[in-house]
């Protein structure tokens, strides 16, 4: 395994990166691709194609702010999964950033499906459940982190979108698509199996 991270803008096959992104996340979870590209031109964003031996196998999108890395998107090409690539990427990110937070679609413990499989993957790779959930753009998310002692607050989560760009226009566009200013954190135990 020879994993490399190549800036999206100098990647040879941008179309493949875009296809991995679109095939890995449902419509409600996805930012418009043009918006990701626009924000990625700023210094606090890492938008990388993930390569193994010069073959594109995945994509990562990280927003950096206040000594935190928000792993907004991580996807391995569906034809390349279960080869240890995702674990290697998370290991590399954890070496680079002391505190990583991410949100995944909330998995219900009694339902074996892709959501639970994804959560188990992150837990196996050094992430912890914060037992905090939020609702954003019609999707219920659970917040995970690799730093068990990090305090997840509304302000921390609000910044994950605000720090994507310095452009007031782009911030406005983001606020119209995703829940930037109206974050309601819920403890998982309070929710039970209910969606809020």
Tell what function each PLM region has.
Residues 1-34, 156-160, 176:
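Short amphipathic alpha-helix that is part of the acyltransferase structural core
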Residues 23-52:
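Active-site rim helix/loop that mediates acceptor-substrate recognition in acyltransferases
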Residues 45-49, 59, 141-143:
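Short hydrophobic/aromatic beta-strand element in the GNAT-like acyltransferase core
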Residues 49, 54-64, 68-75:
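Conserved beta-strand in the GNAT
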Residues 76, 82-95:
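Conserved acetyl-CoA-binding loop-helix of GNAT-fold acetyltransferases
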Residues 96-113:
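Conserved GNAT acetyl-CoA-binding A-motif
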Residues 119, 123-142:
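Conserved catalytic-core motifs of GNAT/GCN5-like acyltransferases
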Residues 135-196:
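C-terminal "cap" of GNAT-fold acetyltransferases
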């Amino acid at each position: 395994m020879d994993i490399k991270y190549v800036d999206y803008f100098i990647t040879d096959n941008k179309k493949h990166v875009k296809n991995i992104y679109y095939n890995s996340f449902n419509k409600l979870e996805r930012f418009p691709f043009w918006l990701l590209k626009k924000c990625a031109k700023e210094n606090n964003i890492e938008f990388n194609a993930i390569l193994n031996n010069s073959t594109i196998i995945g994509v990562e999108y990280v927003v950096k702010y206040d000594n935190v890395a928000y792993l907004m998107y991580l996807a391995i090409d569906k034809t390349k999964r279960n080869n240890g690539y995702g674990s290697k990427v998370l290991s590399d990110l954890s070496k680079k950033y002391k505190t990583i937070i991410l949100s995944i679609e909330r998995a219900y413990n009694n339902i074996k499906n892709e959501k639970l499989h994804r959560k188990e993957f992150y837990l196996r790779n050094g992430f912890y459940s914060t037992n905090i959930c939020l609702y954003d753009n019609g999707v219920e998310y659970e917040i995970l982190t690799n730093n068990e002692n990090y305090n997840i607050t509304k302000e921390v989560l609000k910044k994950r979108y605000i720090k994507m760009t310095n452009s007031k226009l782009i911030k406005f566009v983001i606020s119209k698509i995703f829940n930037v200013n109206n974050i309601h954190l819920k403890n998982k135990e309070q929710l039970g199996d209910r969606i809020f």
